Swiss-Prot record:
PANTHER family: 4-HYDROXY-TETRAHYDRODIPICOLINATE REDUCTASE 1, CHLOROPLASTIC-RELATED (PTHR20836:SF0), DIHYDRODIPICOLINATE REDUCTASE (PTHR20836). It is found in: Cytoplasm. This is 4-hydroxy-tetrahydrodipicolinate reductase. One of its GO terms (biological process) is diaminopimelate biosynthetic process. It catalyses: (S)-2,3,4,5-tetrahydrodipicolinate + NAD(+) + H2O = (2S,4S)-4-hydroxy-2,3,4,5-tetrahydrodipicolinate + NADH + H(+); (S)-2,3,4,5-tetrahydrodipicolinate + NADP(+) + H2O = (2S,4S)-4-hydroxy-2,3,4,5-tetrahydrodipicolinate + NADPH + H(+). The gene is dapB. Its EC number is 1.17.1.8. It comes from Brucella abortus (strain 2308). NADP(+) binds at R34. One of its GO terms (molecular function) is oxidoreductase activity, acting on CH or CH2 groups, NAD or NADP as acceptor.
Amino acid sequence: MGLVVVGAGGRMGQTLIRTIQSIEGAKLVGAIERSGSPFLGKDAGEVTGIGTLGVAITDDPLPVFAKAHGVLDFTSPAASVEFAGLAAQARIVHVIGTTGCSAEDDEKIRAAARHATIVKSGNMSLGVNLLSVLVQKAAEALGPEDFDIEILEMHHRHKVDAPSGTALLLGEAAARGRDIALADNSVRVRDGYTGPRETGAIGFATLRGGSVIGDHSVILAGTGERVVLSHHAEDRSIFARGAIKAALWAHGKKPGLYSMLDVLGLNT
């Protein structure tokens, strides 16, 4: 499967390029960067330190998409919306690991999925997506009258969105377990005199610092006991492997919007 990496010069872009080389059935056929990037014109393999691959980084995505089977995208919300439209024009797979998308962004991506096969997830790791299933089941079994749900996440100092896409993914899983809407029941900020905790609320706490790739814990706190479900990312390659697995799974599927739960056969 011929894959294009967008944001090829970034941390995740370089990780994707390296990881593609080790996965059977996947081949790098294109690399995209923004206009003005210092990486333009350079070989994608040389930028990542793995030697020449014969793939030059360009800022003109559509001709590259037209010759590919799929796109791997961990960029920004605005860029991902643009790439989704181009993937729809090219009728190819678009794997989106970008976080921080607004409701309007998601609607545009959903529209693009009429013609592109899109897999979008707040986290591409296999472990986190299994964790989301466990969180949903725990939230369903341990009801709001007895257990409060708090989601704690920590990432490196450079992360620009909060809560993380993974924290929101886990919050959505907890909300599904409780049969409530996360948007109406989440608490993102606590400061000053807040009063007692509202029954059924799902709280979020965000930490930023150092080089932490991603730590997430879902705490179900009852009277006299706590259940903690956690995931700790130790290497960005877990996200790259998950994204490539998603692309290979989506290749040949009909257009539509899918998630990693679909890829893993965990969507209930």
